[in-house]
Every structure is written in structure tokens, then in C-alpha cells.
């Protein structure tokens, strides 16, 4: 995982969009926005996932393959939905199994921070954070999705500042 400020250029979102010079964003800075990160080791990948699930009460899991083959005729529509700035009522928890991609999150100053993920990364985006997702130029990512009960990942596109989970998110972040 590597995180940095987005350059805000209006070119293909699958490009890195790293500023020049780059402005790195640390794991601690991500945490200040409520984003959690773990690096999972190959040797005991499943054990580490199981421990995080037990600690954080994630009871269920499934897998998604974000690629033309994996999503079939839904691919173009899904990719568009993922990259529209949105939030969810629930956490978005993804353990990357194969491939690469970018999660962009809005930090406390409402700047886009780009998080490059690869196999072995586990990321938790808190409920209520504005974010988006895109593949990179490899056009392939397979992820495990973790969730507590039935997940509520309906994307609510910005602006939705009046939703209770957005307000709850801002309250937690401001107290940090
Ligand atoms: C890497 S999983 C696909 C992206 C997704 O599920 C989502 O909600 C993006 O915001
Ligand atoms: Fe999302």
C-alpha cells in the first residue's frame, strides 16, 4: 500500500495521478480520517483475516473480481459507479487477493488521497467517508469483502451531508 495526494488532473483515472513532487500520506494520517490498514503476510493470510474478523466482529465474507471477465456485461456500469464519489452506511472492508487498484478517500481537509492497493493489503473505509475506487492500467483486481451482517454498500453519491452516518463520521473524525 502506498498513499499520496491526488493531482486532480482530468485525465484517465487509471493513471497514478501522483503529484510531482509526490506528497506521501502516512498510515497515521489515514487513521486520522478513520481509514484502517493491515499488511497481511502470505504465510498465514487466512489466520490474520480470521483474527481481524473476530476482533472487529466481521461475520461474513465473499469475493469480487473487478475485471471485464469477472463482471461481464456489468463491467462498464460498475466501474462508473465505483468511481463516482460516494459513501456507504457500512464500513467498506477489502482484503486484496490478486491484482492492483486505487481507493481514493477525502481527507479531513477534503483533499483526495489516493491509496494504491495490491495483494496482501487489507483496508477498512469507515461508514460515512466520501471515497471512490478505480482499477489501474492492469484492469484486474480480486478482493475479499468482509462484513458484519448483510452489507449495506448502496453507494450514496455526494452530496449527502445530511445523512446520519455522514454526520456520525464527521463527529468521530473531529474528536480525533
Ligand atoms: C475493490 S471492491 C470494488 C469497489 C467497491 O466495492 C466499492 O464499494 C467502491 O467504493
Ligand atoms: Fe464504496
Locate the predicted segments by residue.
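Conserved short histidine dyad/triad with adjacent acidic residue
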Residues: 63-89
Amino acid at each position: 500500500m502506498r498513499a499520496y495526494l491526488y493531482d486532480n488532473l482530468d485525465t484517465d483515472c487509471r493513471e497514478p495521478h501522483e503529484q510531482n513532487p509526490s506528497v506521501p500520506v502516512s498510515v497515521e494520517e489515514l487513521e486520522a480520517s478513520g481509514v484502517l490498514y493491515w499488511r497481511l503476510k502470505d504465510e498465514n493470510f487466512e489466520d490474520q483475516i480470521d483474527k481481524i474478523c473476530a476482533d472487529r466482529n466481521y461475520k461474513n465474507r465473499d469475493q469480487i473480481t473487478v475485471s471485464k471477465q469477472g463482471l461481464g456485461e456489468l463491467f462498464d456500469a460498475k466501474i462508473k459507479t465505483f468511481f463516482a464519489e460516494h459513501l456507504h452506511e457500512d464500513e467498506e472492508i477489502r482484503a486484496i487477493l490478486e491484482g492492483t487498484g486505487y481507493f481514493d478517500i477525502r481527507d479531513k481537509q477534503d483533499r483526495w488521497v489516493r491509496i494504491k492497493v495490491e495483494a496482501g493489503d487489507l483496508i477498512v473505509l469507515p461508514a460515512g467517508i466520501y471515497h471512490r475506487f478505480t482499477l489501474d492500467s492492469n484492469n484486474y483486481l480480486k478482493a475479499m469483502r468482509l462484513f458484519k451482517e448483510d452489507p449495506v454498500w448502496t453507494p450514496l453519491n455526494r452530496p449527502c451531508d445530511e445523512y446520519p452516518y455522514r454526520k456520525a463520521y464527521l463527529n468521530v473524525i473531529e474528536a480525533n
